[in-house]
Amino acid sequence: MTTKIKFTKMHGAGNDYIYVDTTRYPIAAPEKKAIEWSKFHTGIGSDGLILIGSSDKADFSMRIFNADGSEAMMCGNGSRCVGKYVYEYGLTAKKEITLDTRSGIKVLKLHVEGGKVTAVTVDMGSPLETEAVDFGDQFPFQSTRVSMGNPHLVTFVEDITQINLPEIGPQLENYHLFPDRTNVEFAQIVGKDTIRMRVWERGSGITQACGTGACATAVAAVLHGLAGRKCDIIMDGGTVTIEWEEATGHILMTGPATKVFDGEMEG
């Protein structure tokens, strides 16, 4: 008998994933399922697969698999959607929950109106590492490497529309300085504490948004004196607000979480 697996497709600022409650629907070989289901013509279509599970360290756990089957350390947009999922599907009544991820325990604050989660604030912790990167003659810009539990390469440019992201994104993702590959962000200051950003995600390619990438971009902007400690990051799929708390050193990310549809696939 064929097993049916129920899923929910959700997105955070356009960064869309397939969500499965593995306490009800265990998934074998999630790497393969992520590849199969993420295909737009023959699968569901998404940036990847996120598994929600139990944890002995937190209220819930989250595992993230990119569209190419690789497992990610963290997904900021995905964590917001997990918060919406567990609240609206009755897995918790709490409006502040903890989430066990490969990059540590994250604290989520749910903004609820009329029984629905309208936004989620995620305490992303402190940036783990920052470093200037100079490519010499190979690329005509300087970048900043920022780790938010996963690696990011942030580059500020005068005109983001002039960046050929499909061409340069994979070159930088796989550049020899980054043996584990890297996420790639290009950003432009468009107003006071307002930044336009586009992303090439490691393992997924161009996506509509990247939460950890938005955090990394805000960190780089502060370090270079381009923005204050609280700013809006405008991405292709939507906007998130990032605050780098001076007192704690933590990054707070606030943004939307949206359900697209429910469905079921063969296991």
UniProtKB/Swiss-Prot annotation:
Name the predominant localization: cytoplasm
The keyword Cytoplasm appears for this protein: yes
Q: Which GO terms describe its molecular function?
A: diaminopimelate epimerase activity
Do you know which InterPro entries this protein is assigned to?
DAP_epimerase_AS (IPR018510), DAP_epimerase_DapF (IPR001653)
Asked if the keyword Amino-acid biosynthesis belongs to this entry, the reply reads: yes
Annotated family = Belongs to the diaminopimelate epimerase family.
User: Which HAMAP family does the entry link to?
Assistant: DAP_epimerase (MF_00197)
Q: How does it assemble?
A: Homodimer.
Function field: Catalyzes the stereoinversion of LL-2,6-diaminopimelate (L,L-DAP) to meso-diaminopimelate (meso-DAP), a precursor of L-lysine and an essential component of the bacterial peptidoglycan.
Q: Which NCBIfam families match?
A: DapF
Q: What is this protein called?
A: Diaminopimelate epimerase
Instruction: State the organism named in the record.
Output: Bacteroides thetaiotaomicron (strain ATCC 29148 / DSM 2079 / JCM 5827 / CCUG 10774 / NCTC 10582 / VPI-5482 / E50)
What's the name of its gene? dapF
